[in-house]
């Protein structure tokens, strides 16, 4: 937001210097990014009147002018400007004057006594470009007739005016105008605010244009009026051109300039149609697929049902709230106009200009929210200026309100405001702050009920009001207090590890941590979780980040691809992050949202060689059992069961559900071949994802005696059908450990598997396999006897027989 200080001070004039005013605005949340002068430094440039103009004797394009510059003597100045004429007043650079450099960083241009084609020139008549006021170099800068001769041009044109450039946060749409900034300045400084003098013009026509609002969800209010007999050739007043230029807007024509001027003045974009180019009445509606519109910027856009339009009886005439159409644009031949000012719902405008790869001042304002209560006043203000500058006769204002925002009062507790701000602010002082801000309120014990004004779209919840109190009270008045807390020792819970312990454990096993967004592509949810109905974001930062994740697998695969694209050949990653699930049983709380749960999970991925390239081991690809071993070490001392099961993201024959104490806690397996092909991975990574709670919880360490007696090891080889899972045999042996005969069994591990290559190989049928287990037994009280060991082994064999196993002969 850019504007000249002089314009601001016509509305509010606090007794502050420019720098003090800048500081006050910045400390109230309106950050002043820069202060600059309206024009570069100049000297000895004054107002002069051209008394006489004669042709140069030796140059057809030059004139010799007699000029009164208030010096007491008539100056002889040679000039080549096409608009030089007797009687006009123009800037005159006297001998010794310095003009701004022609190029950035150059030296000032000094005016010297000189001769042009043999005629002495005692100065120079200046254009706006030579003074660096604009790029207009078509002729001399003609000054108003009442300008005093001899006056310094810096005083005449207020060239020492300061340009403020303010960086507004998106919620401060009420400050996207000079009057909006003035309103804030008055609240901050306490200086009186002078509103714009808007008076209804005299209605001389009994004519309105038929208007139909077909989409109340697009347009809540539409005000317009017919004006006939305007002079489109009228010259925009210099004061208006100056204010527009210093607000960053070039002058176009009187009608367009007036519309732009009121937008910068009051914050409401409007549009001026050429009335004679409108066919019948106009309709405000949503666009239709297949329609197109040529815009004022020359672009032609294809419309659809997501874009609002203004159309007449034949075609679309304007992109609602964004830009007008070329077919009804005003030109120098325009004599009759239709003036429009409307309230467009912010949601109906937001993102539409970006959809067509451009932006406009109108869209920037409407998508943030523009005052819906002042459309008629703004039509009157624009009409007032048009009649003053361009003439004409105005019809009545046609004002249609169909769907305006219903602003519910917002409650703010004084006690909560003081607690959040950190300083005691009395209720009377808060009432004064709300009054200065123009916020109507009612007192209710320790609280204020504030009804947001029509121009404040940023006030919706209690914290918004607390922010307003803090801003106007003054952040600088809030003392800096370091936090104070009691220092106490906390008991360490040995039954739980911290998530940091888990992260360090994974890092110690050669996994690198990665941190990803919690919002992902909807396609990932379908691929990696089989989720057709993900939790969608209302306002995603990007289309490919539009849903909340329910699994970490997609994020890990994305990071893997990123690394592979940079020629990494061995990748081991992990992430400890939250996933987001729907749960009707979840109630709203301080850290919970009703209907949703946010459990933390730990996911990891291994790809490429199992070990870094080295001389001590052969290079082999990482496999399921490598990652399974890492996970078992992570879960220890808890023992996990790995149950064959299918997951949408994992290989159907190489995946398992992870169970701890009979509860499913996660998944492990190779990436599904379909996804490996889709995401262009040369090899399948092995991944796991586990509930963080299962890793954090652990049993208390129990002390045991170190046996002085040697352990006994026995091997058991059994034959089972190939369809029988090893886990089923382990489950049966685990049950046997509770029996008296197996009380000395310390450990059972699988150390060999053999599958027949033919019907007679190894005495096994083609559908069978041989499994060998090593059983470790030990007694802390004495040496184990053979009969005790034999009985334990026999019990284990009998248990495995229940799963279809027999001893191998």
UniProtKB/Swiss-Prot annotation:
SMART domains tied to this protein: B3_4, B5, FDX-ACB
Which Gene Ontology cellular component terms are annotated? Answer: phenylalanine-tRNA ligase complex
Q: Does the keyword ATP-binding apply?
A: yes
Any single GO molecular-function term of the entry would be: phenylalanine-tRNA ligase activity
Which parts of the chain span the membrane according to its record?
none
The residues forming a coiled coil are none
Under CDD domains, the record lists:
PheRS_beta_core, tRNA_bind_bactPheRS
In this chain the tRNA-binding domain maps to: 39-154
Compartments where found: Cytoplasm
Write out the entry's keywords from A to Z.
Aminoacyl-tRNA synthetase, ATP-binding, Cytoplasm, Ligase, Magnesium, Metal-binding, Nucleotide-binding, Protein biosynthesis, RNA-binding, tRNA-binding
What is the required cofactor set for this protein? Mg(2+)
* B5 domain ranges (all copies): 405-480
Q: What is its EC number?
A: 6.1.1.20
Q: Which HAMAP family does the record match to this protein?
A: Phe_tRNA_synth_beta1 (MF_00283)
Q: Which family does it belong to?
A: Belongs to the phenylalanyl-tRNA synthetase beta subunit family. Type 1 subfamily.
Q: What is this protein called?
A: Phenylalanine--tRNA ligase beta subunit
Q: Which organism is it from?
A: Burkholderia lata (strain ATCC 17760 / DSM 23089 / LMG 22485 / NCIMB 9086 / R18194 / 383)
């Amino acid at each position: 937001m850019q504007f000249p200080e002089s314009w601001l001070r016509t509305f509010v004039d606090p007794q502050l210097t420019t720098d003090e005013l800048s500081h006050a605005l910045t400390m109230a949340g309106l950050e002043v990014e820069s202060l600059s002068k309206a024009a570069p430094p100049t000297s000895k440039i004054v107002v002069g009147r051209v008394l006489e103009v004669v042709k140069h004797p030796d140059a057809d394009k030059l004139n010799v002018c007699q000029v009164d510059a208030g010096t007491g003597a008539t100056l002889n100045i040679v000039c080549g400007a096409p608009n030089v004429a007797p009687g006009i007043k123009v800037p005159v650079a006297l001998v010794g004057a310095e003009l701004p450099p022609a190029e950035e960083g150059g030296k000032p241009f000094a005016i010297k006594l000189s001769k042009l084609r043999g005629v002495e020139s005692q100065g120079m008549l200046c254009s706006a470009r030579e003074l660096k006021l604009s790029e207009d170099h078509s002729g001399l800068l003609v000054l108003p007739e009442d300008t005093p001769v001899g006056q310094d041009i810096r005083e005449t044109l207020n060239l020492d005016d300061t340009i403020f450039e303010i960086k507004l946060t998106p919620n401060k749409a009420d400050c996207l105008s000079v009057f909006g900034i003035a309103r804030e300045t008055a609240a901050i400084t306490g200086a009186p605010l002078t509103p714009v003098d808007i008076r209804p013009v005299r209605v001389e026509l009994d004519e309105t244009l038929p208007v139909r609002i077909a989409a109340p969800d697009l347009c809540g209010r539409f005000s317009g009026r017919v004006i006939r007999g305007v002079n489109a050739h009228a010259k925009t007043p210099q004061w208006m051109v100056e204010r527009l230029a210093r607000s960053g807007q070039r002058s176009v024509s009187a009608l367009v300039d007036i519309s732009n001027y009121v937008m910068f003045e009051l914050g409401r974009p409007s549009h001026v149609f050429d009335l004679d180019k409108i066919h019948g009445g106009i309709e405000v509606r949503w666009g239709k697929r297949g329609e197109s519109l040529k815009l004022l910027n020359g672009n032609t856009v294809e419309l659809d049902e997501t874009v609002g339009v203004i159309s007449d009886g034949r075609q679309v005439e304007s992109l609602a709230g964004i830009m007008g159409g070329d077919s009804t644009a005003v030109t120098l031949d325009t004599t009759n106009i239709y003036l429009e000012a409307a309230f467009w719902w912010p949601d109906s405008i937001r993102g539409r200009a970006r959809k067509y790869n451009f932006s406009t001042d109108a869209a920037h304002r409407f998508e943030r929210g523009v005052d819906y209560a002042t459309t008629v006043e703004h039509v009157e203000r624009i009409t007032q200026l048009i009649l003053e500058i361009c003439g004409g006769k105005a019809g009545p204002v046609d004002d249609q309100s169909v769907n305006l925002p219903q602003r519910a009062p917002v409650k703010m507790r004084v006690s909560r405001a003081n607690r959040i701000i950190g300083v005691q602010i009395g209720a009377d002082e808060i009432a004064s702050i709300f009054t200065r801000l123009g916020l109507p309120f009612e007192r209710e014990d320790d609280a204020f009920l504030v009804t947001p004004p029509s121009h404040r779209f940023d006030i919706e919840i209690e914290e918004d009001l607390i922010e307003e109190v803090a801003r106007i009270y003054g952040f600088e008045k809030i003392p800096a207090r370091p936090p104070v807390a009691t220092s106490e020792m906390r008991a360490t819970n040995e039954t739980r590890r911290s998530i940091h312990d888990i992260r360090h454990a994974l890092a110690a096993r050669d996994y690198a941590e990665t941190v990803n967004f919690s919002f992902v592509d909807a396609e990932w949810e379908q691929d990696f979780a089989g989720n057709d109905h993900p939790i969608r974001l209302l306002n995603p930062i990007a289309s490919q980040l539009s849903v909340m994740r329910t699994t970490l697998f997609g994020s890990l695969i994305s990071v893997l691809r990123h690394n592979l694209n940079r020629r990494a050949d061995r990748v081991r990653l992990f992430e400890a992050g939250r996933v987001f699930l729907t749960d009707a049983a979840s109630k709203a709380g301080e850290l919970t949202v009703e209907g949703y749960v946010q459990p933390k999970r730990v996911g990891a991925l291994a790809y490429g060689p199992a070990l870094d390239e080295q001389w001590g081991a052969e290079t082999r690809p990482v496999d399921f059992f490598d990652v399974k071993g890492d996970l078992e070490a992570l879960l220890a001392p808890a023992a996990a069961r790995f149950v064959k099961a299918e997951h949408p993201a994992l290989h159907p024959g190489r995946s398992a559900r992870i169970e701890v104490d009979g509860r499913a806690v996660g998944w492990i397996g190779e990436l599904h071949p379909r996804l490996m092909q889709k995401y262009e991975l040369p090899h399948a990574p092995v991944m796991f994802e586990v509930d963080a709670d299962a890793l954090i919880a652990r049993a208390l360490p129990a002390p045991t005696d170190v046996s002085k007696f040697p352990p006994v090891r026995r091997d058991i080889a059994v034959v089972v059908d190939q369809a029988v899972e090893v886990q089923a045999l382990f489950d049966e042996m685990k049950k046997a450990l509770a029996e008296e005969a197996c009380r000395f069994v310390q450990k059972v591990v699988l150390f060999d598997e053999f599958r027949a290559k033919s019907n007679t190989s190894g005495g096994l049928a083609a559908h069978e396999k041989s499994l060998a287990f090593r059983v470790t037994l030990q007694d802390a009280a004495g040496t184990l006897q053979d009969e005790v060991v034999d009985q334990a082994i026999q019990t284990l064999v009998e248990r495995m027989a229940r799963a279809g196993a027999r001893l191998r002969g």
